[in-house]
Design a protein with these regions (language model features):
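GH16 jelly-roll
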Residues: 5-7, 11-279
Length: 279
């Protein structure tokens, strides 16, 4: 009876219907899967002209050098990560547990003037009367009245590097009485490398290897560099035999002599001035 049943036309028709139904259900389930939606997105993106251009450029020999590089530090400023940054001079963090001013600083750097919002780091310069510490070369730490406050961040406790590439994207005004700075330094004041210092004098780049004014002072004001207000990518390549400064990947300065025999340095971002700021 079983053989008669499975050999009947009705049974075979029913089996074909079930197989067809099962295949249809599998196809419907596939279209509902995450893998199916990923495949559709992939096929759509393959047609995107910018992505197609990216894959074409990826094969260009010009970019081969970057494939051997390793990323050592980055921050996109989605949040302010205190494990990466401190908001005062390193000596203040290490010895005083407080902020302080040095040299001709007219401002005191305080953490309230540092904030992060929507992927941007903001350093704010404010007219504000405040009493704070100051390093006097004759008397050491004293107190002083400041008329301004500002913001700075550095990686002294989290990241230091010798050789390699250092890069930052900064928004600068066309003209300013304040100095927008990205610089490298260590536990001593020298060497001090300005990757960018932009202010009332214009764009400056270079490094101090000794006291300002001495022969080793190779800081340079690039008067021919004219920058309109906007965002720029400032790059510093520190190599064994040279140092290279770039703006938007265009070389603006190369140094092959008086190269510092420096240890690993940490990165700093600051906004300030050594003169009474204009309006």
């Amino acid at each position: 009876k079983l053989e008669e049943k499975i050999g009947s036309d009705d049974f075979n028709i029913r089996c074909r219907q079930l197989r067809k139904f099962s295949w249809k259900r599998k196809a419907e389930r596939w279209k509902e899967s995450e893998a199916f939606h990923d495949l559709r997105a992939y096929r759509r993106l393959k047609k995107d002209p910018e992505l197609r251009r990216y894959y074409e450029l990826k094969k260009d020999p010009v970019f081969y050098q970057y494939r051997s590089w390793s990323l050592t530090f980055e921050d996109h400023f989605n949040t302010f990560e205190r494990s990466k940054w401190i908001t005062r001079y390193y000596a203040g963090e290490r010895f005083l547990q407080a902020t302080y001013g040095v040299g001709r600083d007219v401002q005191l750097f305080i953490p309230d003037n540092v904030r992060v919002r929507e992927g941007h780091l903001y350093l704010e310069f404010r007219q504000q009367q405040i009493n704070g510490k100051y390093w006097d070369p004759r008397w050491g730490i004293i107190t002083k009245d400041y008329g301004y406050t500002s913001g700075m961040v550095n990686t002294a406790l989290s990241f230091r590097q010798k050789l390699g590439r250092f890069e930052v994207k900064l928004e600068i005004p066309a003209d300013s009485s304040l100095d927008y700075c990205f610089w490298l330094t260590g536990d001593r004041f020298y060497p001090h490398i300005n990757i960018v210092k932009f202010g009332s004098k214009g764009y400056e780049a270079g490094c101090f290897l000794g006291n300002p004014g001495e022969e080793q002072d190779v800081e340079q004001l690039k008067r021919k560099v004219r920058l309109k207000s906007g965002f720029y990518i400032f790059t510093f390549d520190w190599l064994e035999d040279r140092m290279i400064w770039k703006i938007n990947d265009c070389v603006v300065k190369t140094l092959k002599i008086h190269l510092p025999d420096a240890p690993a340095l940490y990165a700093c971002l600051s906004l300030g001035t050594t003169e009474e700021p204009g309006e």
